[in-house]
Amino acid sequence: MIRSTKIVRHLAVRPDRVVDTITLDHHARHRRRVAMTADGGLEFLLDLDRAAVLDHGDALELEDGRLVQVKAADEQLVEITTFNPVRLMRAAWHIGNRHIPAEITEEAIYIVQDPVLEAMLRGLGAAVKPVVRPFKPERGAYEAAEAHGHGQAHAHDHHDHDHHDHGHDHAHHDHAHHDHAHDHHGHDHAHDHAHGASCGCGHTHHHD
């Protein structure tokens, strides 16, 4: 069975290389190694180094370079809205406090149907109604950063080298500052002042 060992994030997907799609709910979009069958019947083995979250529009690259694009499946959700932003923030806090996956938009929060949680949210003054739509819950900060880094690695390669050089410049500056501090080790500590990089004066400053 052909394998897929690489995720191509949606901004980097080339439509001409997409040969099939695979429709997955939010649970199935968090995988490391599993046999999959695409919507058009193509079978392949997802075999990643570590578990990763697949976003709608991402693609799985097969060993021969072809792509299978990911589609988020419609799911039974509830839409949570309030008449003011503070109540929506309060609802978000209670959802997060229970570690419930949630999708947050400007106007609403979406979660998987949960009668107990829905009753609690209504008690907080939120309007709760069932909807059917793709579910794209928020990811943890580390997962989001990792996905961003994976998808933008090539774009940032040159930028990273520039920062590397910049880091060395700072290192030399730190050593120079360290040497300056040693030169003043024997200096009378009664003067409590800082010497600037361009200070050419001696050590006879008097301070009020």
Swiss-Prot record:
It is found in: Cytoplasm. InterPro entries: UreE (IPR012406), UreE_C_dom (IPR007864), UreE_N (IPR004029), UreE_N_sf (IPR036118). Keywords: Chaperone, Cytoplasm, Nickel, Nickel insertion. One of its GO terms (cellular component) is cytoplasm. It comes from the Bacteria. One of its GO terms (molecular function) is unfolded protein binding. Residues 145-195 are annotated as: Disordered. The keyword Iron does not apply. Signal peptide: none annotated. SUPFAM superfamilies: Urease metallochaperone UreE, C-terminal domain (SSF69737), Urease metallochaperone UreE, N-terminal domain (SSF69287). Belongs to the UreE family. Involved in urease metallocenter assembly. Binds nickel. Probably functions as a nickel donor during metallocenter assembly. This is Urease accessory protein UreE.
